[in-house]
Amino acid sequence: MAKLLQQPPKFLRAEWQIANKNQYHRAEAQRSRSERLVAESQRLVDEIEKTTRKSQSDVNKKLEQRLEEVRFWKKELDDKLEQLVYATEDLLLYQTRLQKALESFKEPLHITEKCLEYREKRVGIDLVHDEVEQELIKEHEIIRGVMTLLTRTLEETCEQIRLNRSAKYNLEKDLRDKFTAITIDDICFSLNNNSPNIKYSENVVRVEPNSVSLEDWLDFSNTNVEKADKQRNNSLTLKALVDRILFQTASDLRRQCDVVDTAFKNGLKETKDARDKLALHLDKVMEEIASQEKNIVVLEKAILDQEGPAKVAHTRLETRTHRPNVELCRDVAQYRLIKEVDEITHNVARLKETLAQAHVELKGLNRRQLALQEEIQIKENTIYIDEVLCVPMRKSIPPRDGDDHGEWAGGSHPEAVC
């Protein structure tokens, strides 16, 4: 108990002074450290504030640059999309032209086939593989070749339109994405420290797994632009090709059409000349038939006319056989009567022979008449087929090129016919 009530030990004055000095020094040191910390803190605050302002300014600048870059590419894509849309619209018109041109060649093909079919109805010697038939066959081959070429070109045009639409889809998708990106970056660029809708978000400092590098981003848009340019250039090339094909095919058909029509004209002239010559020969044969018929009448009359003298001579000879006795003499009169009978018999034989020949010739002339009439009919049939059935039907050739400008393929007017 005595120890508990014992007063604490007292320090020496020197110890007291040392203890106070230690407190002074520690307080001074603590204050000094605190002042330095305050100064350092202010410097740090100023530095960080400056750095933050600089970073935010740099971010704003980067956002602005990014906006300019995205807007630049958006404009590029817009321009390419507009060009591609125009090119596709043109190709759709060319597609329609090709379809109409292909359709328009069906009638000329039908006409050519009908002409060949009609000309198969020529008969006899006129069923000849003449120049008209050769040129019609060539025209048929040209039209078939043209239709094959137009069909193939139409397929190429449809495929090019499909490729254009694919490129257009990629451009539109890229444009939508860029529009969204511009909208987002515009919002980000407009934000400041006093914006009401700023807030903390969790886990924002990360790299999205589906994000791409700037090089990939540039390559993506550049690839879309290059593809659009390629398809547009292909479209322009195809348009020029279609123009050439439509012009050349129409020109080829028109030229062959002219050749065929010239062949028809020459063939008709030749056939009509042959018919006229046959008709001339028929007239001469008819005249000769009439002459021969008259000749036969004359010969028959001449034979008939010999009957009287023959009967007289025979009667005289028979009567003179009744002379009596020595009067039955072979005198000059007897010999002359015998000679007369022989002459008449011989002459009648000659007349009958000539009459027989005349009948033979008349039959020959009649056969020739029938042959000439049949041949003339054959020629008339050929002329009818070519002049009445074929030539008028061909006036609707050549076909239109499928354009809506009222012109024929190749640029000639619709009333122009081959």
Curated annotation (Swiss-Prot):
Keywords: Cell projection, Cilium, Coiled coil, Cytoplasm, Cytoskeleton, Flagellum, Microtubule, Ubl conjugation. It holds the Pfam family Tektin. Residues 399-418 are annotated as: Disordered. One of its GO terms (biological process) is cilium movement involved in cell motility. Transmembrane segments: none annotated. Microtubule inner protein (MIP) part of the dynein-decorated doublet microtubules (DMTs) in cilia and flagellar axoneme. Forms filamentous polymers in the walls of ciliary and flagellar microtubules. This is Tektin-1. It comes from Bos taurus. The gene is TEKT1.
